[in-house]
Every structure is written in C-alpha cells, then in structure tokens.
A protein has these predicted regions:
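Membrane-proximal intracellular helices of multi-pass ion channels
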Residues: 1-185
C-alpha cells in the first residue's frame, strides 16, 4: 500500500487505471504529485522538504512563534521565504498551465488538472482513457504537448531556478529600510 503513495511523488509506475479512481482519490494523488520527490532525487514537484518547511512555518505562525523549529533547530527566515516562494511559483505555474491547457484542449477540468500536475511533478501518471489509450497528454495538440514539456522542465529544474533565470538581477543595497507595520487578517 505504501507503494501507492510513493508512485505519485516520484516513481512514474502507472499501476492503476487513474481514470477509474474516485474524485477524492485523484485529489490526494494530485496533492502527492504537487509535493513531489525529496531533494537530490530525479523527481519533480516542490520537494518534500519545501512542503515540510512551509507547513512548519504555517504552524509556527499559528502558534505565535517568531521562527519555525524542528528537532530543536530553528529554520531561518530566508529558507522559509524560499519555501513559500517555490510553493507559490509552482502553484501559479500549475494554475496558468491548467487554464491554458483547458483553453487549448477543451478537456474536463479534473483531467486537465491531473495532467498538468503530473507534468509539473514529472510523475508520469495520466488519467488517459480506460482501455487502449494510457496517456491523455499523448492525445493533446502540438501546443498542448509543448505546454506539458514546459511544465516538466519547470518541475524538474525547479520553480525557483526558473524564476531566477528570468528575473532581473540587481546589486543588493547595503542599507536597510525601517520596518513597516502592515495589518494582516
């Protein structure tokens, strides 16, 4: 049974007919695919450590702590910011890709979300059609296939790396601005 939770994160072994699963099962699989593999591996997704840091930071915020801690070690704010940035960029890329794929291919929302999430995570899973066709993305138009390839590239290289490659670099100033108070919530 543990294999079923590892497959969406890294393996790419399509051991089940994904089109035959229930909607809640598909959403659990999509969540596992979004998180993806652990760092150092060849799988895509936002990575397990990024997800862990994000959850720990949210928990620390709820508890009123200044910094998240785990195993009697604090996690620096720079790491927390990177984890949130990676998660946000991946979520934004996933939603943009799903919307564009919906417009190009005209498939159902669930199938499109599943295919784009699978591409981002490089999991290799597909809802396909029951029967002889196993890959729904294999039936996409050339534009849809190109979008899947771009998502696979973003998922494998990493959302932050892709964002840094396109962002304008500027020299860091040695001064610090005074802290501003912003009302949240």
């Amino acid at each position: 049974m543990a294999h079923r939770s590892v497959t969406p994160r890294t393996a790419g072994f399509n051991t089940l007919d994904m089109a035959g699963l229930t909607i809640p099962s598909l959403f659990v699989i999509m969540a596992l695919m979004f998180v993806g593999a652990s760092p150092g591996g060849t799988g895509g997704g936002v990575k397990t450590t990024t997800f862990g840091v994000t959850v720990l930071a949210l928990w620390a915020t709820v508890r009123g702590d200044r910094e998240p801690t785990v195993f009697k070690r604090r996690i620096g704010l720079e790491v927390v910011f990177k984890a949130f940035l990676i998660s946000f960029i991946a979520f934004l890329a996933l939603n943009c890709a799903a919307i564009v794929t919906l417009m190009i291919e005209g498939r159902g929302l669930l199938e499109t979300l599943f295919e784009t999430t699978s591409a981002l995570s490089t999991a290799g899973l597909s809802m396909g059609h029951s029967g002889s066709v196993l890959s729904l993305a294999g039936q996409f138009s050339p534009a849809g296939k190109l979008l899947v390839k771009v998502m696979m590239f973003v998922g494998r290289v990493g959302p932050l790396t892709v964002a840094i490659a396109f962002a304008a670099r500027r020299e860091r100033a040695r001064l610090r601005y005074p802290e501003g108070r912003v009302l949240i919530g």
